[in-house]
From Swiss-Prot:
Entry-linked SUPFAM superfamilies: GroEL apical domain-like (SSF52029), GroEL equatorial domain-like (SSF48592), GroEL-intermediate domain like (SSF54849)
Name under which the protein is recorded: Chaperonin GroEL
EC number: 5.6.1.7
InterPro entries: Chaperonin_Cpn60_CS (IPR018370), Cpn60/GroEL (IPR001844), Cpn60/GroEL/TCP-1 (IPR002423), GroEL-like_apical_dom_sf (IPR027409), GROEL-like_equatorial_sf (IPR027413), TCP-1-like_intermed_sf (IPR027410)
A GO BP annotation: protein refolding
GO cellular component term, pick one: cytoplasm
Compartment annotation: Cytoplasm
Family per record: Belongs to the chaperonin (HSP60) family.
Catalytic reaction equation(s): ATP + H2O + a folded polypeptide = ADP + phosphate + an unfolded polypeptide
Keyword annotations of the record: ATP-binding, Chaperone, Cytoplasm, Isomerase, Nucleotide-binding
HAMAP family for the chain: CH60
Length: 543
């Protein structure tokens, strides 16, 4: 076991702060409509130019191990916020830095870290309650377009496309983002569906950046039972390899021996495959598998048919243009089933919905109907250069998440307004425990930081802007940094999804609280490498 280096107390917190500041100072310049660009050097290829906070955060690794702990904790805040809400990564980073910096000052003046954390947690709960009260449900297509435009760094073309995509596939529909072969950004709707089951092994991953297994033009084996014996599966695998295609296996389970063989052959490049558990249970699983079979033009191999796995032929397998599998979901894009059969299946489910007397059954049938009829919207992102394409694609992916978040929990005034106004609930907070009160005060001040930073990035004096916005009693009155005007943010279409604001504050406070209550840091000592002697190190020749 390698030797470790341990530091404590004040020294540990100072190192954490140095790491937090290095990461946060690079990320926060991207905040707002006038956020600055960050240029990231790449070992291969051209540098990446981005205004996406999470992209900047992911690139930062610090040489000092203890500083790096602080940077990685804040990076986790940005990543978690992006995963859950799709946006708000920079806001979360700014909040984490603000809470941690203010908290350190309090600890230096003698405050108890645990009481501070309790105060911070209480304040966050109160502010989130206020944000929820101010939330406006998203109903119109215009509002969806506004959210998408802001999330895509104020790109109205992307906003319009996303609103159109959501109109076609519904709020719960599947929207995927791909790279276009031309410089145009286009929208297409195809047959497809998504279900909540992920890959059975991470070794199937083909895209390490997104942690996804992406298979182009695969065959799809739809099997009702467990696959435990690899011998049963071999004929299918051999047939698929022979035609040079990839394979998606959807089954009740793929057990140890069969899964191990599949993984080994995938890693060796013998076959491109991914195994996924079938969705649902009992009769519902059969129904789901039948839906997938009709959508992909295959056959659900169930017990009732009396077909053994080893006798399955290629014409019994489903097909699709693409299948994307991540840790939690499987998305079938462009199922190659007969459209008439898909429509007949949809009509059959609609009839069952009308006839059922059980609310639970009706809910599950409606779920199946939405999956089967919604289809999949594909946004193909185009750009003139490779670096622009990557940056634009990341923005579109953020916008997809944020737009869905808005449909889920509603919207609030954007531009940092919602948090600044919600912090009013903490203005007159008092407690018998003064350190706890101090924790609440820290969140009260931190909630105003995003608004100040947005104004500062746009070239305005943050404190003056904050003062004017905060004093106005209208919950939607804020500062439009793009035009340098004070206005009703919701009417102007400057809005944030409530889920984004909530998630950013919760994640930031959680990470900052963890760092404030940390009393020791442990890191591995770097190994000293033996210096290889060079000709200049040789002893002199005494001949």
């Amino acid at each position: 076991m390698a030797a470790k280096h341990v530091i404590y107390g004040e020294e540990a917190r100072a190192k954490l702060k140095a790491g937090v500041d290095k990461l946060a100072n690079a990320v926060k310049v991207t905040l707002g409509p006038k956020g600055r660009e960050v240029i990231i050097e790449k070992k291969w290829g051209v540098p990446v130019v981005t205004k996406d906070g999470v992209t900047v955060a992911k690139e930062i690794e610090l040489k000092d191990q203890f500083e790096n702990i602080g940077a990685q904790l804040v990076k986790e805040v940005a990543s978690k916020t992006a995963d859950v809400a799709g946006d708000g990564t920079t806001t979360a980073t700014v909040l984490a830095q603000a809470i941690f910096t203010e908290g350190l000052k309090a600890i230096a003046s003698g405050a108890n870290p645990m009481d501070l954390k309790r105060g911070i947690d209480e304040a966050v709960a109160l502010v989130i309650e206020e944000v929820k009260k101010a939330s406006i449900p998203v109903t119109s297509n215009k509002e969806i377009e506004q959210v998408a435009t802001i999330s895509a760094n104020n790109d109205p073309v992307i906003g319009k496309l996303l609103a159109e995509a959501m109109e076609k596939v519904g709020k719960d529909g599947v929207i995927t983002v791909e790279e276009s072969k031309s410089s145009e950004t286009t929208l297409e709707t195809v047959q497809g569906m998504q279900f909540d089951r992920g890959y059975l092994s991470p070794y199937f991953i083909t895209d390490a950046d997104k942690m996804q297994a992406v298979l182009e033009n695969p065959y799809i084996l739809i099997f009702e039972k467990k696959i435990s014996n690899i011998k049963e599966l071999l004929p299918v695998l051999e047939n698929v390899v022979r035609v040079g295609r990839s394979l998606v296996i959807i089954a009740e389970d793929v057990e140890a021996e069969a899964l191990a063989t599949l993984v080994v052959n995938t890693l060796k490049g013998v076959i491109r495959a991914v195994a996924v558990k079938a969705p649902g249970f009992g009769q519902r699983r059969k129904d789901y598998l039948e839906d997938i079979a009709i959508l992909t033009g295959g056959q659900a191999i169930t017990e009732d048919l009396g077909i053994k796995l080893e006798s399955v032929t290629l014409d019994m397998l489903g097909q699709a243009e693409k299948v994307i599998v991540d840790k939690e979901n499987t998305t079938i894009v462009g199922g190659k089933g007969d459209k008439k059969k898909v429509e007949a299946r949809i009509e059959q489910i609609k009839k069952q919905i009308k006839e059922t007397t059980s609310d639970y059954d009706r809910e599950k049938l409606q779920e199946r109907l939405a999956k089967l009829s919604g289809g999949v919207a594909i946004i193909r992102v185009g750009a003139a250069t490779e670096s622009e394409l990557k940056e634009k694609k990341a923005r579109v992916e953020d916008a997809v998440h944020a737009t869905k978040a808005a449909a889920e929990e509603g919207i609030v005034a954007g531009g940092g307004t919602a948090l600044a106004k919600a912090s009013r609930v903490l203005e007159n907070y008092t407690s018998a425990n003064k350190d706890r009160e101090l924790g609440v005060k820290i969140v009260y001040n931190a909630c105003k930081y995003p608004l100040k930073q947005i104004a500062y990035n746009a070239g305005y004096e943050g404190s003056l802007v904050l003062e004017k916005v905060y004093e106005d009693q209208d919950k939607n009155y804020g500062f439009d940094a793009a035009n340098g005007e004070y206005k009703d943010m919701v009417k102007a279409g400057i809005i944030d999804p409530t889920k984004v604001v909530r998630t950013a504050l919760q994640n930031a406070a959680s990470a900052a609280g963890t760092m404030l209550t940390a009393e020791a840091l442990i890191a591995e000592l770097p190994e000293k490498k033996e210096k290889t002697p060079t000709p200049t190190d040789m002893p002199p020749d005494f001949d």
